């Protein structure tokens, strides 16, 4: 099966939307305080937040059985910098981003996923509207309906 994964993030929250056919599932979460992760998840930039959203979006999608083993996931990037990091699989100077890439690669390997990265115009990012306040009520803040 094929999916499109849209994601966005800022210093307070991150969101992701998984589109499978005509069905779109939207989720949004607040970043936990940094002390809960021993300082490892001290989000300092929107780019870091987007990498968290990408990692959590894939992990969550697998956990609620929307994304399954051997599925193809079209990762919809609205940041050229992030897109370049992902397609080149290059190290950055940001440990949080490098850790997220490592965890994403682990998920891909363990579940035999095929990721295909796409660079898109930010106005086409359907996950962005949940952070902007325009459509906050359409994204779920929990997984109760999926488990």
Regions found by a protein language model. Give the residues of each.
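Extended, charge-rich low-complexity interaction segments
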Residues: 141-147
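RNase H-like nuclease fold core
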Residues: 1-48
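RNase H catalytic domain
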Residues: 55-133
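Acidic helix/loop or adjacent segment enriched in Glu/Asp that either coordinates divalent metal
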Residues: 28-75
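Short, low-complexity, polar/charged sequence segments that are solvent-exposed and flexible
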Residues: 23-26, 93-96, 134-139
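Basic, amphipathic N-terminal segments that precede the first structured/catalytic domain
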Residues: 1-13, 124, 133-136, 147
